[in-house]
């Protein structure tokens, strides 16, 4: 494979590019990137990450989000975080917005991580609530308010009660949306009617990105989708959401969704990281294994995944 050529940009040019991006609203399909590791899992595979970014942009995704749950952010050191952000920001070079996952339990750490992300060139940050202390609404208002006061880039609030142990209901988000920088929410429950309720309660203060139900959310007012499946199938994922949310073409979007649907069980649920990395291996794009305690996808599931990828045309058919 040819080496990836990354355009060289001066600090002034990169800063100007970032300012231009921030003035535009985030919308469309944003891939929450996996983190490639070396074969022994001991280091982040930065060249593989750069190839992944190029693969995503070449296939039309609208934005990139490293260091989310799919990126195994809780298994990443502080130095590795900095290297990941540097790689994604510099490789994308202003072609698509880059949001960085900066969630942590301690508000002070979230502030520090968010400031670092902004200093490294991020266009925004995605922040899950503190996930052990089960904060109240006043505590959440204080938490997000402190971060918003510390940075000048937009915040995407991340609601995932299955992992955060706190559920940001539409009524709570209506209050959080009054914090000026909290302009987006990633809504990751399986209650798709919440998209409708957030749109109604928040108005233009906060826009909705689907976190799970991309197809369904598009019809209820979501302007974006933070997708795991777009790691593996970026063009199909992007086209499906765009055709539903912005073209309002039911027949075309449903046809695309039906093509994508067989992949979703393998990149969702408890094995979403191992399934995504196994898919890349089958596609000839090695991304390493998940870090423990996650384990690789079992062989029987890998065989089933291979059949799905063949059916989608993402890997070649077996020789007759």
Give residue ranges: language-model regions.
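N-terminal amphipathic/basic-hydrophobic helices that include classical n-h-c signal peptides
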Residues: 1-12
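C-terminal alpha-helical cap/extension of soluble enzyme domains
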Residues: 10-21, 25-36, 55, 59-61, ...
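Active-site beta->alpha loop and helix N-cap motifs at the rims of alpha/beta catalytic domains
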Residues: 11-165
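Secondary-structure boundary/capping signal
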Residues: 96-97, 155, 184, 206, ...
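Catalytic alpha/beta core domains of metabolic enzymes, predominantly
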Residues: 149, 161-268
């Amino acid at each position: 494979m040819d080496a990836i050529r990354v355009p060289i940009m001066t600090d002034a040019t990169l800063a100007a590019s970032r300012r231009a991006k921030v003035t535009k609203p985030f919308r469309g399909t944003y891939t929450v990137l996996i983190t490639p590791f070396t074969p022994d899992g001991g280091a982040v595979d930065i060249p593989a990450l750069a190839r992944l970014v190029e693969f995503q942009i070449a296939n039309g995704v609208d934005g990139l989000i490293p260091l989310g749950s799919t990126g195994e952010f809780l298994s990443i050191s502080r130095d590795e975080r900095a290297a990941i952000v540097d790689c994604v920001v510099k490789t994308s070079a202003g072609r698509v917005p880059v949001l960085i996952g900066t969630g942590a339990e301690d508000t002070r750490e979230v502030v520090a991580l968010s400031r670092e992300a902004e200093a490294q060139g991020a266009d925004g940050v995605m922040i899950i609530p503190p996930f052990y202390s089960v904060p109240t609404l006043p505590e959440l208002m204080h938490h997000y308010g402190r971060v918003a006061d510390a940075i000048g880039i937009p915040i995407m609030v991340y609601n995932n009660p299955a992992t955060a142990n706190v559920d940001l209901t539409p009524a709570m988000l209506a209050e959080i949306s009054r914090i000026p920088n909290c302009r987006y929410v990633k809504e990751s429950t399986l209650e798709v009617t919440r998209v409708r309720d957030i749109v109604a309660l928040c108005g233009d203060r906060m826009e909705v990105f689907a976190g799970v139900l991309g197809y369904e959310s598009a019809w209820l007012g979501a302007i974006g989708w933070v997708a795991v499946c777009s790691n593996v199938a970026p063009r199909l994922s992007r086209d499906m959401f765009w055709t539903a949310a912005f073209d309002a073409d039911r027949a075309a979007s449903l046809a695309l969704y039906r093509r994508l649907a067989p992949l979703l069980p393998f990149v969702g649920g408890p094995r979403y990281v191992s399934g995504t990395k196994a898919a890349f291996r089958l596609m000839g794009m090695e991304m390493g294994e998940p870090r423990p305690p996650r384990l690789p996808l079992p062989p029987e599931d890998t065989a089933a995944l291979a059949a799905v990828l063949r059916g989608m045309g993402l890997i070649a058919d077996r020789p007759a």
